[in-house]
Amino acid sequence: MSDIHFGGEDAAAVAAATAFANAAPFDLLVLTGDLTQFGHHDEFAAVERWIAQLPRPLLATPGNHDTPWMGVPERIAAPFARYAKAVGPPDAERFETDALLVRTINSARGWQIRLNWSKGHISRLQAMKAVRRMETAAPDALRVIACHHPLMEAVGGPMTARVRGGRYAASRLAAAGVDVVMTGHLHAPFVQPLPFGDGMTYAVGAGTLSLRERGSAPGFNVIETLGDELSVTAMAWDGKALAAERTWLVPLRPRPGKGNRDSWKSTPRPFCKSAS
């Protein structure tokens, strides 16, 4: 889940997404940032109460709105202290099984040497640490990176991310065999291949569960592995109910290991739900 923006959340959509998350046996729930609107203490308290209602396992990474917008000294000196207290470590968290490896990268910054601090930044060190972790994945594991900002601009997206270091990170992650880069920030769902390597590293963006809609209804993504394909379904809240708005099916790269993804076909399970 991502871009809930507590303090400006769509309460009905959040309640529906929470019920949905608790109703199905997801392998992992991912929160891709902007959990608060202004990084206020009361907003993080709401986030903490909400996360307590969500199923486990759960993995999270912060967004640019998760720094204290009104407290500039704290934003510069300790931008993610409030996030860490309410949610957990802001960077390099991971979930790992023989079938799945997910690692977070914190693409948000409390401040930057540019006017718009809301844009993303991934250092080369962050990228290479993530690459090294991906290289330790089990041979047949789906490899996933979760961060707030899209590493490269989404075609037709409602806004930009302008991630410094994004192109370098995308190219290195693709070379490392990453299958999915999950993000938020744009408040609109999309699936696009990154233009590197074999073209089978996919940027997957989720919508929003806030009132800050940008041309898409509040919603989240359900991501499943179906044999040698990846299915991404954008769920949308119409004010009364959740429904599948669109589904993308894209091919997954073959694995050199001894296992076979075909063994999953009989009982496909969502490995992650991204509500944003």
Where are the language model's segments positioned?
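N-terminal active-site segment of His-dependent metallophosphoesterases
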Residues: 1-53, 69-70, 136
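Conserved beta-sheet core of the metallophosphoesterase superfamily
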Residues: 155-228
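Active-site environment of divalent metal-dependent phosphoester hydrolases
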Residues: 7-9, 37-42, 64-72, 109-115, ...
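Short acidic, glycine-rich surface-loop motifs adjacent to enzyme active sites
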Residues: 134, 138-154
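Charged helix-capping and loop-helix junction motifs
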Residues: 15, 43-47, 122-124, 159-169
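A short C-terminal boundary segment appended to hydrolase-like catalytic domains
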Residues: 225-276
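Active-site neighborhood of phospho(di)ester-bond hydrolases with catalytic His/Asp-centered motifs
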Residues: 1-2, 29-34, 58-64, 105-106, ...
